[in-house]
């Protein structure tokens, strides 16, 4: 959600998380009030710490492709250990290992699985490639 009122709409979908594109402290606060886990988008340490001060314990590094696993490694050195960081944007099965090695807890994946006009078979194939890569990382 981009605005606190949009967070209210998520309750009707029975969601447990509230993913947003930026570090909007009002959205984080409203998500917490509603019992949702906020996952704000951040790109700088300043944004990350603002989100943490507002109550977020999960952060979406976006767009991750404009940063790097080295960025994550540096952030992990200063972020509280209880804060999870997720790479979103530009993640591929081939680069997941580097992100995990640097300290991400997981990924948000969209356009590398689904593109407008894609067939169900194409989407399924792409999703399976990510699942296979993730399972290989966890074994």
Task: Describe each model-derived feature in a short phrase.
Residues 31-39, 78-87:
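Short beta-strand/loop segments at the ligand-binding rim of alpha/beta enzyme cores
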Residues 8-12, 47-54, 91-107:
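Catalytic cores of alpha/beta
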Residues 43, 52-58, 72, 84, ...:
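Catalytic alpha/beta core domains of metabolic enzymes, predominantly
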Residues 1, 86-91, 107-111:
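Glycine-rich beta-strand-to-loop/alpha-helix junction loops that act as flexible
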Residues 31-32, 116-139:
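C-terminal helical cap(s) of enzyme catalytic domains, especially alpha/beta-barrels
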Residues 1-3, 9, 15-23, 36-48, ...:
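Catalytic beta/alpha-barrel core
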């Amino acid at each position: 959600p981009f605005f606190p009122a949009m967070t209210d709409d998520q309750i009707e979908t029975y969601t447990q998380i509230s993913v947003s594109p930026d570090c909007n402290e009002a959205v984080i606060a409203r998500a917490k009030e509603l019992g949702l886990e906020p996952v704000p988008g951040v790109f700088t340490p300043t944004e990350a710490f603002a989100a943490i001060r507002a109550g977020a314990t999960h952060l979406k590094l976006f767009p991750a492709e404009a940063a790097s696993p080295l960025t994550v490694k540096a952030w992990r050195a200063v972020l509280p250990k209880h804060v999870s960081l997720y790479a979103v944007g530009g993640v591929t099965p081939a680069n997941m290992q580097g992100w995990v090695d640097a300290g991400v807890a997981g990924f948000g994946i969209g356009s590398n699985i689904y593109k407008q006009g894609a067939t169900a078979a194409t989407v399924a194939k792409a999703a399976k490639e990510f699942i296979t890569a993730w399972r290989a990382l966890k074994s």
